[in-house]
Amino acid sequence: QTYDNVWVKANEPTAASQYVTSDQCLGCHSAGGTGLQYDMTAPGTDTKLINLSPYGTWRGSPMGLAGRDPIFFAQLASETQTFHRDAAPMVENTCLGCHGILGQRQAEIDSYAKNGTCEKFSRAGVDAVPYPPDNPSAPLAHYGALARDGISCTSCHRMVLGKTDEAKYAGQPQNKCVEERQQELNPGLAGFAKTFTGSFLVGPPDQLYGLFQEPKKKSMKHAIGNDPEHNANVLSSELCGTCHTVHLPVLHRDQTIGHSYEQTTYPEWAFSAYRTGSTPDGPLPFGAGAQAQSCQGCHMPNKDARGNPYRSKIAAIQEYTNFPQAEHALPPADIDLPTRAGFAQHTLVGLNVFLLKMAWQFPDVLGIRRADPMLSTMGIDSIPTSENAMLNQAANATAGITITEIGSAEGALKALVTVTNRVGHKFPSGVGFRRAFLQFSVLDKDNRTLWSSGRTNGMGVIVDHDGAPIAGELWWKDDCSARIDPDARIHQPHYAVITRQDQAQIYQELVSTPPNVAAPTCGPGAKAEGQLTTSFLSICAKVKDNRLLPQGFLPLADRIEISRALGAGADMAEESGPTEVGDDPEYVNGGRDAVVYRIPLSELSGKPAAVEATLYYQATPPFFLQDRFCTSNSTDTKRLYYLAGKLDVSGSTQDWKLRVVTSGPVSVP
């Protein structure tokens, strides 16, 4: 972070200063910036303050860490070294268009201004630093600094949404290369859908958009030459959906043979009971769902645990009335800030506690500072704050679980485990390798395990009663010399009934490559004929997708109508649905799943006294990590190997899994 400072160039802002690093914002939008007033804080532990400011909550989130995420960069290395070596420039530019968005976009803006072309931003550009000044990357150091800043302030607060604003700013210098990206990644899509994969347009370089009306403008204008402007679109879910709908080329033999949806978090929400039914362009078919809630309503909380709206000033500046007198100060009408209701934390977390642990335990490896730059020792550092938000979300806002119908009959112990999805999209959602799974255990009176499905070893590998990995858990031989029967696409199916300890209910998405033929058929409904893959640009067919549907998930015909209203095709509606779940009535109706466990009493070494069911989550399952380590030998891969090998996962992520919810022991009658 020492190098990561990019400020507005001299004179009025131009497209050459479209993007700046977050340190240009933290002076005012982090708590404690004045040293006298402590707005945007709450009491923490040990007399320390929790920094609730936009910068304070963002900097330790996965969004703030996106430009340094070692998991992402290892995935990118596999894509460019093994999966799609000949397409590496396109792959790097595409992926860094979200994870390193500031650097990628500013580099394209500047290249277009210089020579009229959109030069692709590379992985090497992310590492560019200014010192020593004769190092080869020094001329590109400001792009590296911007990219490492992650999904930062000017990523979102310049975004324009809706046909009116897009028409106003289309064709301007800051959007020339974005429009080219839209044509490359989203051909044939229109309206909001053409902004998928982070392909949104932005406003001018001298405006920043926020939710509050009538903001005091002069402080920001004097500091960075920008006017803060009210724009209600920052409250819309489309602000998130443009990046959290990932539409990518399908590559086969170095050619694009189609496009597929790698990630459908936004459509999943738009098809659920949580949909608001409106966009910046107006209402959508079928209106709001019964539990309407925007993305920001969950991931950017503006209320405390009791439901009371946060009230705070939205910046920490040297006001006229509340500070000692000073010469040349602006009048109170210009710099005295009102207390606002609805102040939103930029928490922006899911459940990737593993990433936060890597950042906290190895800050020197990721090049970050742990200490709060403004509150210093007075404040709780941002990464623990983000981790606590994740743990709270896991425990209280993700899923429910119950065990019913416990009894013995026909020589077997039987129990019904029901899992309820409490989030506004599939669970898990986001990148397709995330997974959740059930552990169901039979216990004796001394709490010893007599039988268990879904138990793991210390590395998070799901194992059977003998400790051997169950089918599909590992993709490679231990020495990475070969895949394990890759054409068989071995995996755990979606179960309605489980009877053995080498069976486990895993909620996941699995996809396959195009088959090795000249003209493969890919897309919704295509038969899986290739190999299981973790490549984002090889998604030809789905093998399995039984991730828990959100409440109120609409039928296909309704999903297609909404998809078309958003400017997408029927394929988005189809790809957002489940795959290979059969006619399981407990699943297909949405919002829940139920599994019957039927255990032969002859397999129990003692008398069953209780049963227990627990839902676990893995952001980086063992097969995914193994595929990283076996498909690249890059510096980024070695870095992830080092971090994963030395990571202390004790506590919330013991045995490389995060407990979401548990039934606790339930007595066997």
Residues covered by each model-derived region:
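Extracellular Ig-like/FN3 beta-sandwich strand-entry sites
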Residues: 606-608
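Membrane helical hairpin/interfacial module
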Residues: 78-92
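Short, flexible, glycine/charge-rich loop motifs used to bind or transfer phosphoryl groups or to couple energy/partner
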Residues: 15, 85, 229
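Conserved, well-structured interaction surfaces
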Residues: 92, 97-108
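Local sequence-structure signature of Cys/Sec-based thiol-disulfide redox active-site neighborhoods
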Residues: 9-27, 88-92
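Primarily the internal scaffold of c-type cytochrome electron-transfer domains
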Residues: 1-7, 32-76, 112-579, 584-589, ...
